[in-house]
Amino acid sequence: MLIEYLICQSARGDVTLTRPKVLITGASGLIGGLVIRDLSQKYDFSGFSRRPVAGIPHTQADISDIDALRRASKGMDMVLHLAAETQDYDDWDRVMDITIGGTLAMYRAAQEAGVKRVVFMSTGSTMCGYEWFEGSPYGALAANEYDRLPPGAKMLDYRDPPRPDSFYGVGKLFGENTGRLFSDKYGMSVICIRLGAVLASDKPEMVRHFPGYLAQADAVQMVDKCLGAPDSIRFDIFDAISENSRRWRDTSHAKELLGWKPTGSADNYDPKTLAV
């Protein structure tokens, strides 16, 4: 995965360069569309989602359909797993069926197909429960009481205990932990991205977006860095948030290990014009 193009040699000795084949689950969503739009010159994408996707080979099926996933995973170098329940973060039945059941089906199909790497799209919701406890500086940031992390309050990162704020976050923690299992047991490289708030408008839409806002370009760059990360990364978790002054999750791990360089910032917008 460290090289962007795979070198193939024919029986005649001719050498050609081919783009890595990447299956995108949940390809019809916002992140999938951005990745396909911006990275198709670099990767050979195929899609998998319940809604059709134009412009790339596509399988229209439910993420829990493991037989369809098995067929779609054949011949793939990597899987970018975006599919999840996003309509109702606290609908446990749908989280169980889509976010948990679908993620397990994806890992199983990828492992059986010999996929070398899964980039699993996790979420900041795995940590946003830290905003809830009394006197939380993180909650105060989300409520517009501070314009930056107060002195003495630490930045949190992937090494801190998870504290989900919803069943959605619980489901994503299942995906992270299952990824670690498949990495340890089967040798698959699994990289998890704890995504910040990526919005269709590409700007914060409420005050609580300001700590965790992630510009679309920064999100796409993170996906690219994870798909192309060194083969030596067998399992890891990276926080993805733009350069927001109210940020309370530390993104230095991705900057140092992957060379990720976010350029967006919620500071370009005025929280006074938005609802809490």
Where are these predicted regions, by residue range?
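N-terminal Rossmann NAD(P)H-binding glycine-rich loop of SDR-like oxidoreductase domains
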Residues: 22-38
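Rossmann-fold cofactor-recognition segment
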Residues: 55-64
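NAD(P)H-binding glycine-rich loop region in Rossmannoid oxidoreductase-like domains
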Residues: 63-98
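Glycine-rich NAD(P)-binding loop of the Rossmann-fold in SDR/ketoreductase-type enzymes
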Residues: 64, 94-102, 170-171, 214
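Conserved Rossmann-fold NAD(P)-dependent oxidoreductase catalytic core, especially the SDR/UDP-sugar
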Residues: 105-165
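Conserved beta-loop-beta element that borders a ligand/cofactor-binding pocket
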Residues: 166, 176-201
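Alpha-helical substrate-binding/gating segment
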Residues: 184, 195-201, 213-235
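Conserved C-terminal active-site "lid" loop/helix of NAD(P)H-dependent oxidoreductases
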Residues: 235-261, 276
